[in-house]
Amino acid sequence: MPVSTLQQEIRRRRTFAIISHPDAGKTTLTEKLLWFGGAIQMAGAVRARKASRHATSDWMELEKQRGISVTSSVMQFPYRNDGGDYIVNLLDTPGHEDFSEDTYRTLTAVDSAVMVIDSVNGVEAQTIKLLNVCRLRSTPILTFINKLDREGRAPIELLDEIENVLQIQCAPMTWPIGMGKSFRGVYHLVNDTVQLFDPKAETEKGATAGMIQGLDNPELDRVLGSQAEELRIDIELVRGASHTFDKDLFLAGKQCPVYFGSAVNNFGVQSLLDALVGLSPEPLARATQTREVAPLEDKFTGFVFKIQANMDPKHRDRIAFVRVCSGRFERGMKLLQVSTGKTVAINNAITFMAQDRNTTEEAYAGDIIGVPNHGTIRLGDAFTEGEPLRFTGIPSFAPEYFRRARLNNPLKTKQLQKGLQQLAEEGATQMFRPLASNDLVLGAVGTLQFDVVAHRLEYEYGVDAIFEPHECATARWLKGKPEDIDKLIDKAGHNVAVDGAGDYVYLAPSQVNLRLTQERFPDIQFMETREVV
């Protein structure tokens, strides 16, 4: 393929995730972005109490029942504005804290992120965790302060909190005029324009209650009354006291442009989307153990950042989500699966619009494709046109909670093993088989995961399982010479298990036991996290 065409296609890609604390409005914003992008027909009330439809990105049965996002959905849509023609890849991540591991891995597959802040609650615990994950990779962040149609905290106070708590500079790009019942719109600092808000006018794309050019325009006083003068004072203060936007600082992950709006009313969403495609980076280079992979290389490379079982329960399928890192994917191309050394023909890769899928004819760096997986593809696997690359930075965490699986019907043991194995391959839970028993022990980073697994076992595999507490306080992967690990198994084999990848894990009954065991076996590394490579 000519370099210019490859370059053109890659340069129009934007791949980002939305991060927030639960209930900040992330799912609503996701749906409104899809609506502005033309990917869905209506932007209705997402998960409203009486609504019969569910958010486009919350497709799993349990998510529909509970109203929280528990898996990362991937959605692709085209978007065109005055600046050009773009392909947007939006990764919706779980907001609930028990799903941080899945979110962490999803953030390895994006080039930028939108952070949603609730104007009523400000910076919350999960936002802090997720921003710290983005900071590890210097991911550029855009901030959307949501729910301006409610009585919230003062905008200047919110910016101060973001800067102090999250340690990132804020550069306001829009500024709200009032809030709650007196919310009248936003002022665009970059082009000196007031965009007026009227909830009745915001039902069509591009519709607005009106635009007024210039802060000194007398029309502003006529429309806003006393709020016009308040706005002028606010803007003078903001221009003097806050940071002006610096693209280099933004791309380095040190400054975030800030937009205000009300996602539920479609207000401010299009400005955010325009900023996202205009300011965010095109696909970035990715690190491997041997070299950096540049997106414009002509040979295809990609890595698996997520595995999802039963995206379509009718087909009992498993899909490996692959981030394309370089070159172009073509349907039917033969690729090396680096971990197995085998070459596979990828004939039926798919692209996503939440649960709607289409067969992928081609994809470029920045895109996410789904590769059907029959149990041979693992998290972190690399696919290339022959080069034995291993991408770095895809983490797996030691679980903090443990349960033993028990069946109500012992005849379903085979289905239980298969279900737990497949669900563990997704990486949100981990399955351990203790060497000293036939137990199946499940580990997770949060207790909600066990409810999710029990529900999915019943709904997707027809298995009724109970999860009982297990006498394990923490887990550590074992790394060392085979003879040293054999000695540990000889002395403390009752606490050693094998994980889904066949690696040895020490299941410590207490922190004291772990410390004493580490002292007794100083030549073995007891690892809390490890990279999936």
From Swiss-Prot:
tr-type G domain mapped to chain residues: 11-284
Main location: cytoplasm
Residue sites binding GTP per the record: 20-27, 92-96, 146-149
Key words of the record: Cytoplasm, GTP-binding, Nucleotide-binding, Plasmid, Protein biosynthesis
Pfam families documented for this protein: EF-G_D2, GTP_EFTU, RF3_C
A GO biological-process term: regulation of translational termination
Signal sequence, renumbered to the chain: none
Cellular component, GO, one term: cytosol
Compartment(s) of residence: Cytoplasm
Molecular-function GO term, any one: GTP binding
GTP-binding among keywords: yes
Alphabetized InterPro entries for the sequence: EF-G-like_DII (IPR053905), EFG_III/V (IPR035647), G_TR_CS (IPR031157), P-loop_NTPase (IPR027417), PrfC (IPR004548), RF3_C (IPR032090), RF3_dom_3_sf (IPR038467), RF3_GTP-bd (IPR041732)
UniProt similarity note: Belongs to the TRAFAC class translation factor GTPase superfamily. Classic translation factor GTPase family. PrfC subfamily.
Role: Increases the formation of ribosomal termination complexes and stimulates activities of RF-1 and RF-2. It binds guanine nucleotides and has strong preference for UGA stop codons. It may interact directly with the ribosome. The stimulation of RF-1 and RF-2 is significantly reduced by GTP and GDP, but not by GMP.
HAMAP family: Rel_fac_3
The protein's name in its UniProt record: Peptide chain release factor 3
UniProt source species: Ralstonia nicotianae (strain ATCC BAA-1114 / GMI1000) (Ralstonia solanacearum)
Gene name for this UniProt entry: prfC
